[in-house]
């Protein structure tokens, strides 16, 4: 009964979750400028965005259909990653020069390659930089996110392997394209 409903309407749930994540991104962009005073709220919203990203993918895959907002899913994720890096920069863990360089490198690499895999490779790097910020800021959140990641790795091993392959493919594509243009 429930599986049938998810199969028929799962893409609508995925669209709702993508919309919620978009609103979370807007709010994160608004509050990130307040610095450490909003650390807990910021990380709770990041966790909510991460959870909604996992769930919208689940519902879309179970319905075997992309929702109307599926094309915006990666862009919403990218906005959240940029905001997270900006927040780490505001907290003093990265310089604004590094932030600008990294963002420019991401945009140029994606623009030159026209490959979603290249952008996903950068997404992975944004996640690592975000984890570094959490690691340096809060013992509680460090433990929370380590447990969360361990759970994701345990329960979503196959999906994680796919994402690792996409990460490696993205960098291979970008680097091989650059090397072939130099020849």
Locate each region found by the language model.
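Multi-pass membrane catalytic core of lipid/isoprenoid biosynthesis enzymes
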Residues: 14-18, 62-113
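Sequence-level detector for tyrosine residue identity
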Residues: 11, 27-30, 58, 64, ...
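Helix-coil boundary and interhelical linker segments in multi-pass alpha-helical membrane proteins
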Residues: 23-44, 82-98, 132-145
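Membrane-interface helix-boundary signature
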Residues: 4-17, 35-42, 69, 73, ...
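Core segments of transmembrane alpha-helices
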Residues: 18-27, 74-85, 100-105, 120-133, ...
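Membrane-embedded alpha-helical segments that form the functional core of polytopic membrane enzymes
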Residues: 16-68, 100, 104-105
């Amino acid at each position: 009964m429930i599986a049938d409903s998810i199969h028929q309407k799962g893409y609508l749930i995925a669209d709702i979750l993508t919309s919620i994540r978009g609103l979370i991104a807007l709010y994160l962009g608004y509050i990130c400028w307040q610095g450490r005073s909003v650390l807990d709220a910021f990380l709770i919203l990041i966790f909510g965005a991460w959870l909604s990203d996992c769930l919208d993918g689940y519902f879309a895959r179970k319905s075997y259909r992309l929702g109307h907002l599926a094309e915006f899913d990666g862009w919403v994720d990218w906005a959240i990653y940029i905001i997270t890096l900006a927040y780490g920069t505001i907290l003093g863990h990265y310089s604004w020069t590094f932030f600008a360089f990294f963002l420019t490198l991401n945009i140029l690499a994606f623009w030159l390659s026209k490959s979603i895999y290249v952008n996903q490779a950068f997404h992975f790097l944004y996640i690592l930089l975000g984890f570094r910020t959490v690691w340096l800021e809060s013992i509680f959140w460090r433990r929370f996110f380590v447990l969360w990641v361990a759970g994701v790795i345990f329960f979503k091993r196959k999906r994680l392997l796919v994402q690792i392959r996409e990460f490696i493919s993205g960098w291979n594509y970008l680097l091989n394209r650059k090397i072939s243009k130099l020849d």
